[in-house]
Structure formats: C-alpha cells, structure tokens
C-alpha cells in the first residue's frame, strides 16, 4: 500500500512496490546526455519532470524543451518518442496506465503535448491549499495527473474508494498522514487505520478494495501528485456521508447501508 522511493531498487516499478495492480510508476534519474525511450505504445504515458531540463523528442528527431514542472502526455500508439537530459541532468516520474485497445490507424490522435505546472490555472486555491488538474491540459484521455498542496493540518478530498479507477499518490514535499476507512462490509475484517507519510512515499489505492483513503497534511504543508485511471463505469463511495457517485451517469446519491439479509423472510 505504501513504498518509499529511497527504499526501492532503481530498476523496480514503484507502483508495483506499493501494491498497484494495473498501473506503473518509475523514477528516472538521467545524467547529462542520457536518453530514455517511450514505453509500451499500447498504454497512455504521463511524465512529470521533478528537476533538471532536457528535451522531449519525436520519431523524426524534433525536440521540445522540457523543464521542472512539465507534464508530458504520450498517447496510445505514439511510437519512437524519447526524453533526453540536458546539461543539468533530468529527474522524471513516469506513470504508465493499463494497456488499452490499440486505435485504428485512422483514429485521430493528438500529438504528444506538454503543460507546465506554472502555466495551468488552479481548479482550487484557498486557505486549505491548491489543486491543479494538470495532465488533462496536456491532452490525457485515459489517465489523469493532478498536483496538490495541502496547507498544514488541512485535508484533501473526503474519504472515498473506487470500484474501477486505480490511483497512485506521490508525496513530493512535506509530511502528513493517509487514513484508511473500511466500507461497512470491510469493517467486519478491519478497523480504521492511519499511516504516516513523507516526501518520497508512494501510496497505491487499487480498485474495488472497499477501503477508502483520506490525505491530511501534518505540521507543515504537504505537496503531492495524484495519478489515476479514468474509467467511465467507475462508482465512487464516500463512507463518511454514505454517498455514491456514478460517474457515467453524472449522479450522486445517498444510500442506506443494509445487511445482506435485511428485509428477507425466512423460508
């Protein structure tokens, strides 16, 4: 459920180390002049530049400069793309989504695109912190990457769990806690848990666990990336308020939890 990038071998997938099922994450540290090729073209890929500078190159060798705070999206079936480190090296997080249907050659695919954190308007900015929907601005379709900052003592999204979406959180700065809230059925097997988290921690939340998650900053502000798949059939449950969100229907409703045998007659 939680892994720290300093405690995971460089060649190992950080997402898998944290318990991810269908998504991947690697931290790439490139020395000046190093190049890393695009991964599987059957999966949407999102890269976030943590430090340094370099260029994102297409199969024709045309390069676009990249720098810290850049979010780069490479769509399904794009091939031959690479990332090259400049004179200061390059540190990048590479998120890889689940394998998708390979589009027909006639499908209209946007080219790989880049959005910088400093150039994207925040969806929310206030006393609790700041929230930037980042990868969507760079053209992501099947997955998403958001940047968040929680001010000291403040919490993020309310406790929730997904039926189909898978999420990864990467703590970039500061520290805090992640709380795990079991659904009524899961509560028969476990109690609510709280885990300490800090910069470098990767938190995995696979789908259909029946266990909700909840982030809160500690005595200092906490900055993090939130990555997730975007499944149209996902159902999201909010245990604190007993709400259900059907994304594909655009509907949020409150339900009454019941036991399996509630209302049934004995034969």
PLM feature segments, named:
Residues 26-41, 146-162, 210:
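Conserved short histidine dyad/triad with adjacent acidic residue
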Residues 29, 48, 62-65, 149, ...:
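Residue-level "contact hotspot" at macromolecular interaction interfaces
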Residues 43-59, 164-166, 170-177, 181-184:
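Glycine- and acidic-residue-biased ligand/ion/polar-headgroup-sensing regions
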Residues 37-38, 56-57, 74, 80-87, ...:
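Short beta-strand His + acidic residue motifs that chelate non-heme Fe in jelly-roll/DSBH
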Residues 60-78, 182-207:
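Short acidic-glycine-tyrosine-enriched beta hairpin
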Residues 1-24, 100-144, 152, 237-267:
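A short, N-terminal "cap"/entry segment at the start of jelly-roll beta-barrel domains
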Residues 73, 87-102, 204, 214, ...:
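A short hydrophobic beta-strand segment most commonly corresponding to one strand
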């Amino acid at each position: 459920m939680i892994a720290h990038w300093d405690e995971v071998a460089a060649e190992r997938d950080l997402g898998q180390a944290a318990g991810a099922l269908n998504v991947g994450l690697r931290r790439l540290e490139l020395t000046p002049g190093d190049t890393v090729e695009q991964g599987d073209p059957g999966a949407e890929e999102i890269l976030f530049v943590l430090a340094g500078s370099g260029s994102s190159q297409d199969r024709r060798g045309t390069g676009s400069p990249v720098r810290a705070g850049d979010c780069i999206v490479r769509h399904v079936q794009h091939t031959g793309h690479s990332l090259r480190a400049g004179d200061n090296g390059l540190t990048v997080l590479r998120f890889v989504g689940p394998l998708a249907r390979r589009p027909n050659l006639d499908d209209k695919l946007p080219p790989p695109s880049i959005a910088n954190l400093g150039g994207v308007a925040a969806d929310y900015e206030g006393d609790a912190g700041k929230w930037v929907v980042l990868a969507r601005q760079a053209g992501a379709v099947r997955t998403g990457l958001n940047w968040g900052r929680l001010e000291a003592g403040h919490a993020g999204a309310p406790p929730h769990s997904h039926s189909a979406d898978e999420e990864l959180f990467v703590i970039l700065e500061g520290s805090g806690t992640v709380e795990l809230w079991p659904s009524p059925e899961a509560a028969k097997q476990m109690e609510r848990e709280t885990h300490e988290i800090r910069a470098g921690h990767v938190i995995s939340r696979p789908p259909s666990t029946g266990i909700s998650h909840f982030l809160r900053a500690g005595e200092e502000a906490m900055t993090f990336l939130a990555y997730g798949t975007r499944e149209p059939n996902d159902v999201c449950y909010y245990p604190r308020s007993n709400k259900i969100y059907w994304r594909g229907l655009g509907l949020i409703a409150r339900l009454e939890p019941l036991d399996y045998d509630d209302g049934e007659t004995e034969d």
